Regions:
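Short beta-strand-to-loop acidic/aromatic patch adjacent to the donor-nucleotide binding site
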Residues: 80-83, 90-102
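A short, conserved beta-strand element in the Rossmann-like catalytic core
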Residues: 54, 74, 102-103
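N-terminal glycine-rich phosphate-binding loop and ensuing alpha1 helix
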Residues: 2-49
């Protein structure tokens, strides 16, 4: 079963516009999240789904897979679903990691993936 960890990311936050590109220790926040997700041992793909060209270009410049989604995607789950349906048809499992989780533990994503692979009803 092929597994993708998708990081939905948007620029137009009401409380903190541009948060994904805000610098944290000299790097954009979204890059910290990508680095954590890439440490997942069970994921076949780590990618970002965004509706913003600035985020798209930044993520691409760091060599990560990134998918452009329409602005009509109102939630991160909508962005993940769009990317899955449009670009990742041969994947079976999708894990949603929010773009503002720079301290996300990759082992937790691996546990989720293992659970999903073991229990086909989930």
């Amino acid at each position: 079963m092929k597994t993708a960890v998708i990081i939905p990311s948007r620029y137009a936050s009401a409380r903190f516009p541009g948060k994904p590109l805000a610098l944290l220790k000299g790097k954009p926040l979204i890059l910290h999240v990508i680095e954590r997700v890439k440490k997942c041992k069970r994921a076949d793909l780590a990618a970002v789904a965004t509706d913003d060209k600035r985020i798209f270009d930044t993520v691409k410049s760091f060599g990560c897979e990134v998918f452009m989604t329409p602005a009509s995607c109102k939630s991160g789950t909508d962005r993940l679903a769009f990317a899955a349906q449009r670009h990742l048809k041969d994947y079976d499992i999708f894990v949603n990691v929010q773009g503002d989780e720079p301290l996300m533990d990759p082992a937790l994503a691996d546990l989720i993936i293992d659970s999903l692979k073991k229990n086909k009803k989930l």
